Curated annotation (Swiss-Prot):
GO CC terms, sorted: chloroplast thylakoid membrane
Entry membrane topology: Single-pass membrane protein
Keyword Transmembrane tagged: yes
Gene: psbN
HAMAP family for the chain: PSII_PsbN
Protein name: Protein PsbN
Keywords: Chloroplast, Membrane, Plastid, Thylakoid, Transmembrane, Transmembrane helix
Signal peptide positions on this chain: none
Transmembrane segments: 7-27
Compartments where located: Plastid, Chloroplast thylakoid membrane
Predominant location category: plastid
Family membership: Belongs to the PsbN family.
Amino acid sequence: METATLVTIFISGLLVSFTGYALYIAFGQPSQQLRDPFEEHGD
């Protein structure tokens, strides 16, 4: 394989991994610990 192909696959893998991790933090088990500023602000 060419170097450019390997670099493209590596960067794409990093992007997919980061996106998956961000979705896990936002909607997965750790999201229960996040605070919701809209819930804290009562009108």
